[in-house]
């Protein structure tokens, strides 16, 4: 089954509520009442106002070659008033250096820095079935931070704050937007996509962009094949208080027989938990009293799991060979923190799955973010892939305008698809393969992955290559 799914991936890759409107403009105002039909024409409509969709709207609005385009951002949720609370949210993202660069170029990063974030300067990943580990140190690899931990709602607030600034005059936002359906153009030369709303409003656009998540209605309207499956695992998240105050700039991940458990630093005393485990175990974790939950979590981080004597002997021998060549043998390691308590009501669970749209584009349509691809959170790459989509799509649209072409010109949309699939697909395959490799506990498999981990940890160029791909 595992081999079949991996082969399938490779083969396919080869071949009614009230609506509130905010107008981010001094000249383009729009009525959005429930009385009768109102048809508005836009150059670009973005379906989905999450982190990726809002960032794309901001990127288009701030690009000098694209700022003349009339853009509509449709968000299904009502407009939320953000307030920075003393306690951290339980949903966070690990932003890469490339994502930071994108946010800085759009003047979004300053809003995040003025609120709060936590840099990750070290990362340690180790196997509970063999104790083989790999560690990354920002000073040794990139001379910069490995990642930045930011709360989802804070990031979205920062993007919206910049998006609604007076600098951006060509973007309209409709909150509480309930879309009833799409009529998509069949040909590039006559791109005229229709978006129908539940309240009777109708919008048309040259370019429709689906940023509407893993269950994308835009992707469904395109009629493209979407390869997807569930992992029969759930992710359990929570906000944790550490037993001792530390610098806390290390991200920890331990591979258990049931899946990875990870701690992401928030500040000197708190960390965010992402624990991937079986559905049955996850449901039990969510129901446990707080003290029992903390005990089980500390066991997951510290407990000694049974090791195969043959695997231990082979990894010890291989470690001594590495040491004889002056390479690190993996014996030196940091110890993870102990957990003191869990923030009340911070525990939550969500399903885990894989998704790959075989096409990111159609005439006058493009997909970004989870609408195009979905990955397991074990490598923290999901949202970074989406922000990479934003960067590339904005650049290709600007290039098309610079060349005197329409933003729906097929060759330029094709360039976007090719560029992103060349980056996203290998990442998706690698993450899926890692998940499958580490959820098998047979001694021969444990031995192979342990030796591979030891070798990778010993070879700095390979570690640099891994980090280079992860941050682009």
Regions found by a protein language model. Name each.
Residues 34-52, 72:
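Beta1/beta-strand and adjacent pyrophosphate-binding region of the FAD-binding site
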